[in-house]
Amino acid sequence: MVYCNAQNNDVTQKVEGKCFDGYIFSEKYVGFNPLGDIDKFTPNESDIVKAEKILKEQIKDLNKDLLNQVGNCPVIHKKLSKYKRQYVGTKTENGDKVIWINFIWSKDKDALVKLSEEIIIVLDGCSYYWSVKVNLTTGKLFDLSINGSA
């Protein structure tokens, strides 16, 4: 079951499922966008459920190198439910729908304060902070980016 609640600012929507919790950023969002000047769309509940299903099925293989996941840093595919998410919908030149998912460790209270208001970018922090893209049209997970350590 998924629950969505519109936020007061009309730019984000709360979305929750059995193993995920986060915010959908609408195409109206004008704050900092790490994806640059792109063709955006607003994902709906079914887009997020599909993206999370693809993520769950494919992240272990995509994460086989375990980049920046040593010592005290979590192995991301084993701790998916420990991350809060931010979802941004984009479209490719071919018209494919892609969702960029930004993952923030759920115990980082400072970062979580702004989770519904702006895209959170953290430098360093190893695998406590990472992102990935999901092509909803092709069903492929790609462009895994895991923060490094200082």
Language-model features: locations:
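Bacterial Sec-dependent N-terminal signal peptides
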Residues: 1-11
